[in-house]
């Protein structure tokens, strides 16, 4: 039985997490677990301040820092990493169309997350062609 992972206490999975781990290997892609959404506003943003704010959210929210691991017997566990500065991506879609931007964001959603010892969230700061700016959460 795993007690710690990379110096962090481990916890059993919730019923919902166990269900995901049960059916996910039978799916064509682990991206079946991904949900992507954008949040934008029609105003110019201070991108450095937004990046700083996103990192503060990561620091405050343990749920955004959950990682999964398996022990030698194959049992899944979860653990929470310490806060660290994340490299927040920026995508400038202002030179294209809204449809092209949406297609790219949909493509991001098709990429599965690594399930072992890796982040399970992704946030991209986005500048849209229609003058809206914000973030894409995945």
Residue ranges and their predicted role:
Residues 83-89:
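Short, charged/polar, Gly/Pro-enriched secondary-structure boundary elements
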Residues 3-81, 95-138:
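Acyl-group handoff/entry surfaces in thioester-processing enzymes
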């Amino acid at each position: 039985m795993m007690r710690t992972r990379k110096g962090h206490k481990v916890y059993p999975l919730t019923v919902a997490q166990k269900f995901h781990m049960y059916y996910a290997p039978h799916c064509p892609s682990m991206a079946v677990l991904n949900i992507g959404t954008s949040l934008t506003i029609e105003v110019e943003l201070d991108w450095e301040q937004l990046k700083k704010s996103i990192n503060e959210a990561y620091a405050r929210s343990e749920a955004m820092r959950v990682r999964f691991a398996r022990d030698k017997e194959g049992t899944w566990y979860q653990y929470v990493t310490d806060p660290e500065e994340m490299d927040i991506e920026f995508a400038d879609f202002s030179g294209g169309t809204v449809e092209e931007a949406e297609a790219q964001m949909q493509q991001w959603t098709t990429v599965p997350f690594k399930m072992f010892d890796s982040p399970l969230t992704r946030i991209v700061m986005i500048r849209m062609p229609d003058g809206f700016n914000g973030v894409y959460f995945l």
